[in-house]
């Protein structure tokens, strides 16, 4: 009598070359710098999964998604002179603007207008500190001006999915009306650093 083979969970046909992905979580939901450090270690470890140009310094881009650190953003926005309020009462957007001052300022103003038209309140901008010295020449030539924009949750909108839905709509309207700015993320829960 022939024994029937049980199907295995592993199937070699699933194997193929592609970008790598990693995940680091604190199962208790506690936000720590250690989680960020571990995520960056994964990014470094998966370097072989990303594309690079001939010079070996310019990659095809990588990023990490994090929970918004309210304590961090509370501190930096107070230093900038505006109040973001309580946790989940605001959204943070990560924007890649052109370096050209006129185009950058036009895009920023357009976002502020769209936010207001969507019934939200724009709070302020923050320039994100960067370290261009680690970039290859090609990446340096294309490096955007990176800023974060802060948007306040209206009192009549619930925290969570309702507010994030309004942020998503504002983001999509902005993206469709502006072709020189990339929005990495805009949320009250998470932020993407690239």
Model-derived features: where do they sit?
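N-terminal segments that mediate ammonia production and transfer
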Residues: 1-194
